[in-house]
Amino acid sequence: MVKKKFEGIRDIFKDDAVKFIILMGVMSLLADMTYEGSRSITGPYLAILGASAVTVGFVAGFGELAGYVVRFFSGHLTDRTRSYWTITLSGYLINLIAVPLLALAGSWEVAAALIIIERVGKGIRVPSRVVMLSHACSQVGQGWGFGLHEALDQIGAILGPLIVAAVLFFHGSYQMGFAFLLLPAILAISVLMISRSLYPNPHD
C-alpha cells in the first residue's frame, strides 16, 4: 500500500505540467525574494534620501495603480499576440532589474521612478504568466496546481524581507540590501529562461 502511494506520487512529479508548475513556482519564489525584499525597505530608503511621508505614500500608491492599469493593456496584448514568453520575460526583466538599481539611486526622485518601474514590470508580466500557468494547472487540477505555485511564491515573499533584514543587521546599509537582491533576481531570470527552453509552448 505504501509502495503504491509512493509510486503514485512519483508518477505525478513526472508529469510535464507539474514540472512546469514547479519551475515557475521556483522562479516566482526567487522573484518574490527580490521585490518583496525590496518593498520591505523602500519606505525608509525614500525617507533617508529626503522624501516626505506624503511622497512615500504617493509613490507606493501610484506604483500599484500604474501596475494594475498596465495589466489591462498587457492582458489585451497577450490575447492578441499569444506571445506569452516574450511578454512574461519582458515584464520580469523590468520588474527584477529595477530592484538592484535602487542601490545606485542618488536621489529620492530616481528611487521613486525605479519603484514605479518595478511595479509596471510586474503589471506587464502577470497576465501572460497566469495564462501559461492556467494551461498547465488545467492538466493536473486547477486548485492543486495553483496551490503548489502559490506555496512556492509565498515562501519567497517571506524569505525576501528576512534576508534583507539580515543584511541590514550585519551591514547597516540599504544600498547593500538592494545590491544583494541582484542574486535572486539573476537566478529568477535564469530559471525563467530554462523554463522557456524546456517548454516553449506551455499553452499547447
Q: How does the language model describe each region?
A:
Residues V70-S83, L168:
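Helix-to-loop junctions at the C-terminal end of transmembrane segments
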Residues M176-M193:
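Symmetry-related core transmembrane helices of the 12-TM Major Facilitator Superfamily/SLC fold
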Residues P44, I48, L159-M176:
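Transmembrane alpha-helix termini and helix-breaking/packing motifs in multi-pass membrane transporters
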Residues T86-P100, L182:
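Structural signature of the two symmetry-related core transmembrane helices
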Residues V2-K4, R196-D204:
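Flexible cytoplasmic inter-helical loops of multi-pass small-molecule transporters
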Residues L114-I155:
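Cytoplasmic helix-loop-helix junction between adjacent transmembrane helices
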Residues A103-L114:
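Helix-loop junctions at membrane interfaces in 12-TM secondary transporters
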Residues G8-L65:
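Helix-loop boundary and gating motifs at the non-cytosolic
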